Structures are given as C-alpha cells and as structure tokens.
Amino acid sequence: MPKLPRGLRFGADNEILNDFQELWFPDLFIESSDTHPWYTLKGRVLNAHLDDRLPNVGGRQVRRTPHRVTVPIASSGLRPVTTVQYDPAALSFLLNARVDWDFGNGDSANLVINDFLFRTFAPKEFDFSNSLVPRYTQAFSAFNAKYGTMIGEGLETIKYLGLLLRRLREGYRAVKRGDLRALRRVIQSYHNGKWKPATAGNLWLEFRYGLMPLFYDIRDVMLDWQNRHDKIQRLLRFSVGHGEDYVVEFDNLYPAVAYFKLKGEITLERRHRHGISYANREGYAVFDNGSLRPVSDWKELATAFINPHEVAWELTPYSFVVDWFLNVGDILAQQGQLYHNIDIVDGFDRRDIRLKSFTIKGERNGRPVNVSASLSAVDLFYSRLHTSNLPFATLDLDTTFSSFKHVLDSIFLLTQRVKR
C-alpha cells in the first residue's frame, strides 16, 4: 500500500480520508535556518570607498506546522480547516536604504544598503473576540428586533409617539393659521400641559436615543415580518474580522559600523478573524458555553425570547454610557438571547500580523542624516486554529473613546446634569 502524504489516511475500505488528528493538532517543529545571512554596503564615506558584504544578525527561531494535504469531505464537499501556525520568536524585517550627508570638512557620505536584516519585539498576545461577538450575535439572532426591550420600554415609546403626534398637529395648525412662530413647537418638548423651548443638546439626545431607536425598531419588526417564511440554505459560511494598529519602535541600528545609526517606528496591523461553516436546523437555540444548543422547553424559549437580563440592563438609567466603556450589553445579549438553531460543521480562529507602514530616521553624532528606505517583512506572526465554537465575550474596559458621536453625547449629557 503506498504511503500517503501527511494529513491523509486510509479508511476501512482503503478510501482516502482526512487525518483530522494531524490536521487539527499537528506537532510543531523549529525552523532555524537564516534566510538572509548577508547584507551589502556600498558607496563613499569620509572619502573612503566601501564595497562590503557583511553578516546579518543570526539566531532565527520560528515554531511552525509542517505542510499537510487535505481532500474534500464527502458529506459537505468542503475541505476541512487545518491548524496552521507560523510563530517567530521575533519579527524580522529587511531594509534597503540610501543614506547620505555632507557636514563639511570632509565629513560626508553617500551609501547604499541592501538586505539589512533586523528584528523587533513580536506583539503576538492579542484577542479581539469582544469586537467580533456583536456581529455574531446579530447574524444568528432568531429575530432582528429585541422584543423584550421593546415591551419593557413600551410605556416610554407610547409617550414619545404621543409627543411626535402632538408636534405634527401643532405644526399643521401653525401652517394653517399662518402663525410661523408657532412652528417652533415642532421641535419643542411638552410637559405638564406646557411647551418648553428646545436646546441643541436636547434635540441631539432626542435624535440619538429617541428618534433613531424608534426607526430601527420599526425597521427590525418589518424585517422579521418579511423574513418569516424564508428558507435558509442548507450549508453556509460566515466570518467576521477586526484589526487594530500597533506601533513597534526600533533604535540603535548600525548597518555601517559606527558611522551613523538608524531608528524609527513600524506600524503593524494585528488582525483577528473568526469563521464557521454551518448547517441550519429547525427550531431555535440558546448560547451555551461557546456553542449553540436547541432550546429544551417552552420556558427556556420564552426566557430567551424576552432576555430579561438584557431588558433590565437596557432600562437602567445611563446604561448606554456604561456600554461605551464596558461591554456589559454585548455580554448579556450574547448569553441570553434566542438564536437560530445551527450545527457548526467546521470553523477557524485566525490571528496574524502584517506590516502596514514605517518611518525611519538617521543620525550621526547627534546630527540628522538623509535616509530614503524601503522595508519588507521576512518573519511575521500567523496562527489559524481549528475550532467548532463561537467567539466568547468577556468583560473588557475600553478607554479609547474614539467615537465623535459619543463625545457630543457626553457634552450634552453633562450640560443637562449641570443645569439640574
């Protein structure tokens, strides 16, 4: 019997099958061969001509998976996800540069550097699951609308609809009578039988947390009605990703012995993507420790449909402000809502790092020199793990506060508190 490539095995009837133990849990090996052992330095410095071939830094260490082969799975026609890891001890970059200066009195140079290798810290420890979870929660939710929250906020919604109708009526009357001053009531609030003048802050907060949520609720209910008879395909793929920049600094690079030094920053993008292949089943499901399981009885179905913990949180005053910094709402939504019932056939969790941009400077004896350079990556981090679970949200503090809308919200909320 012939020997099969790594990743395959013979079945009971000598058919060729995937060896999932080898594909999903492979043994890693260490790759230590230096890919760029030399760099060249050519040009003129201090009236001396250089044409040197110099050794690059050694000691390369990369933990990686071996190459394996797969065949399509008979039941689905898809090739299985394989675990792939390329885990360098340090990130490696290749620099090509031209450096020149002229400080007078013979202190000048014009040098060309090719294939100069240097290494930096590898920021491999990252997990952006909290950014992926809301999109999974929304994609596999049994309903677009949050009916529990809509029921909990029903009284406030009715009051707000009454205010909108009152405004429309007053606007119609003002136009009919030709009383343009009375048109101001279209944007004013009404309390205890009196109209109160509007402020920019009140209008903004009403738009953000009154009018827009109302429109979204109406849209979601209409989508649920339109999709009530949809037939979902037998097998689907779904994936979401998130990336964030990370800056690594480097200093004290001396490609030309002690003539000058280089320093700068490298902007890396750390990316996290999670994906699944899944089959749809009849009925509904709930979240259970990273996976979805069918509901067990009508009580569990009703509880997940309402999601009382999320409703209680949504009805808590200023809970939306807390959600700017702590992902409480995302956690309650993921763990308590009602889902479509699916079977996860295959899946992956991938993290990698890619080179995005760089800046570089040179100096000689504290004085800047001219540097034009290009940079390419040699060893970057890559990890793709097989998984059959969904990403899991954990409590996380976010202090970036990068949303301009949240900045405006904060200003107007503080203004309201000060006025009180």
Swiss-Prot record:
Impact when changing residue 412 to S: In strain: Qbeta_2_FR and Qbeta_3FR
Effect of residue 219 to G: In strain: Qbeta_1
UniProt keyword terms in alphabetical order: Cytolysis, Host cell lysis by virus, Host-virus interaction, Viral attachment to host adhesion receptor, Viral attachment to host cell, Viral attachment to host cell pilus, Viral release from host cell, Virion, Virus entry into host cell
Record note on what altering residue 404 to Y does: In strain: TW18
Known outcome of mutating residue 418 to I: In strain: TW18
Effect of mutating residue 218 to V: In strain: Qbeta_3_FR
Consequence when changing residue 100 to G: In strain: Qbeta_2
Gene Ontology CC entries for this record: virion component
Result of changing residue 29 to L: In strain: Qbeta_2_FR
Mutation effect (residue 374 to D): In strain: TW18
Effect of residue 254 to C: In strain: Qbeta_3
Localization annotation: Virion
Region (RNA-binding), start-end ranges: 158-176, 226-236, 294-298
Effect of residue 76 to L: In strain: Qbeta_2
Annotated Pfam families: Phage_mat-A (PF03863)
GO biological process: adhesion receptor-mediated virion attachment to host cell; symbiont-mediated suppression of host cell wall biogenesis; symbiont-mediated suppression of host peptidoglycan biosynthetic process; viral release from host cell by cytolysis; viral release via suppression of host peptidoglycan biosynthetic process; virion attachment to host cell pilus
General function of this protein: Induces host cell lysis. Inhibits host MurA activity thereby blocking the synthesis of murein precursors necessary for the host cell wall biosynthesis. May be responsible for the attachment to the host pilus. Makes extensive contacts with the viral genome.
Subunit structure: Interacts with host MurA; this interaction inhibits the first step in host cell wall synthesis. Interacts with the capsid protein.
Protein family per UniProt: Belongs to the Leviviricetes maturation protein family.
Protein name in UniProt: Maturation protein A2
Organism: Escherichia virus Qbeta (Bacteriophage Q-beta)
